[in-house]
Design a protein with these regions (language model features):
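Solvent-exposed, polar/charged alpha-helical surfaces in well-ordered, non-transmembrane soluble domains
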Residues: 52-60, 88, 102, 106, ...
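Axial heme c-ligation environment in periplasmic c-type cytochrome domains
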Residues: 78, 88-89, 107-137, 154-162
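Gly/Gly-Pro-rich "capping" loops immediately C-terminal to redox-active cysteine motifs
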Residues: 71-105, 126-130
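N-terminal secretory signal peptides that target proteins for export/translocation
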Residues: 1-9
Length: 163
């Protein structure tokens, strides 16, 4: 509680204390909010319910480019005339498993350019307006559930490094 008799003769000091106190609360409060909105990897390839949702979402939003069996497009490593690449496979023959869950989540949510170098051309759209976070995590759980055990273990090492 502020001593009002002190403030009557020292308005500028009281004002400064109030401003600094508010800024401190804002920084501390902002850190709490930031900590609450940072998402940890939530793609569980052993969760049948999450996998089922992920398969439905994948079929509706992803299979058109990445293939109904996660096979991707032919020649996915060869640049197209417009400078972008065909959609890669999400099975063990692709590079999806080389990335941590959070990285994959961000690419789906914010689009292919999110982690790409400047001027990189990507046909991967952002799904932040179309899919919920839970649906994106479910798609990742579905994809991971299709990988062989050894690939899942290698990809989990990426998650461990990023925690």
């Amino acid at each position: 509680m502020l001593n009002t008799s002190f403030c009557s003769g020292h308005h500028w000091i009281c004002s400064l204390l109030i401003v600094l106190g508010s800024m401190t609360l804002g920084l501390v409060g902002g850190g709490v909010v930031q900590a609450q909105t940072t998402t940890a990897p939530q793609a569980d390839p052993d969760n049948a319910e999450q996998i089922a949702l992920g398969q439905q979402v994948y079929t509706s939003f992803c299979a058109g480019c990445h293939g109904s069996n996660l096979e991707g497009q032919p020649n996915w490593q060869k640049k197209l005339p417009l400078g972008n690449f065909p959609a890669p496979p999400h099975d063990e023959t692709g590079h999806t498993w080389h990335h941590a869950d959070q990285w994959l989540f961000e690419v789906v949510k914010y689009g292919g350019k999110y982690h790409a170098p400047p001027r990189y051309r990507s046909a991967m759209p952002a799904y932040q307006e179309m899919l919920s976070d839970a649906e994106i995590w479910a798609v990742l759980a579905f994809i991971k559930s299709r990988w062989p055990t050894a690939i899942r273990a290698q990809q989990e090492q990426q998650n461990t490094r990023n925690r």
